[in-house]
Amino acid sequence: MLHSSLLDNTVQLAIDDRVLILNSAADPFVPKAAQQVVAGELLLAEDNIALLQSAYAALEREHSMPGGRNSLSRYRHVPFHEYTLREAPATIDVAVMNMLYQPSNAWLIYGLQVTGYALKPGGRLYVVGAKDRGVLSMAKRMQTLFGNVETLEISKGQRVLCSRKMDRGTWSPDTGQISLVPTIFAEGKLDEGTRLLIEALEVHTTDVALDIGCGAGFIGLHIARLASKGQVTMLDASLAAVDVARQRAEQGGLTNVQVLPSDGVQAVQAQRFDLVVTNPPFHLAGIQTTEIAERFMREAAQVLRPRGRFYVVANRFLKYEPTLRACFKIVEEVGGNTRFKVLRAMDPIRASTRPGDL
């Protein structure tokens, strides 16, 4: 990955540095950084549980290799959205962010604010990104927040930027009030696809239901209200999303809900459900893809009971039907409009061969 090679060439680390990785834990630079800070600490401020698991695996591989020097006790995780709530200010020597891993501008801006809170005076922030991902705008933000920014390297449209936290700046412990959640989860607002999915759902009072990639929880909480004698499990790889969904379940007085961090259905793969729903993302690192949705469909077929129902909402131009037909015997459109379609799939293929099915 070009981004990581640029970081390898430009990020300067001392052996006793405390290094903060800002929502970029899966970057190949991370295990290399761990090898360098043999007397310091590596903090992974990461939101995505799947990427965190990938980072841990890479660090463990590096540790087990001949000559591997990084101690597994010298790195730890803190949820990205809770950094200023859990960590003391002005304790970090170097912070690193790869723009590729940030879902939107809100995450980038929050990362800058966290950096200002976290860095010691004289500490450095390194940001790597592409021009088409907004690295030039990022440079302007860094200049505004820190009063300085330097371009350390340019290669094939990629840049490495560096800002230093000055001895006297606008940052103080009061910036612990920084919050990511309100900017990425609009209170009380349903997107069009979610609304159409909710309208099309058939929910039974006793349903045992699963919401894969629940986000802020609109779909799962709607099901929980209708399945009053059932149980709803909501999953998301985003720790921020899990927190928001849990809070909304508590605020709604819903006791038949559990919300779990999970990479796909990993956390519940041994369980079986009457109803499975998803409104999957179709962008990954800024690139349109059906990879995540297709994975959710295959996993839904593995956890759905033979007589269960699976619902997915998608933009009309996304061709989910071939994957659905490979996983289910019955696939039909049950809702939507000119922009979106709601698909229902039933009778998962080979469902009767799986243990635990009823």
Over which residues does each language-model region extend?
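Conserved proline-anchored active-site loop of SAM-dependent methyltransferases
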Residues: 94-105, 212-216, 273-287, 300
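A short glycine-rich, Lys/Arg-flanked "PGG" loop and its adjoining helix->strand segment in the class I
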Residues: 109-121, 293-306
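N-terminal auxiliary segments of SAM/dcSAM-dependent transferases
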Residues: 102, 106-175
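Glycine-centered, small-residue-biased loops immediately flanking beta-strands
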Residues: 123, 230, 308
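Short beta->alpha hinge that forms the Motif I/post-I loop of the SAM-binding pocket
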Residues: 47, 130, 236-241, 292, ...
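Conserved SAM/SAH cofactor-binding pocket of Class I
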Residues: 1-76, 192-278
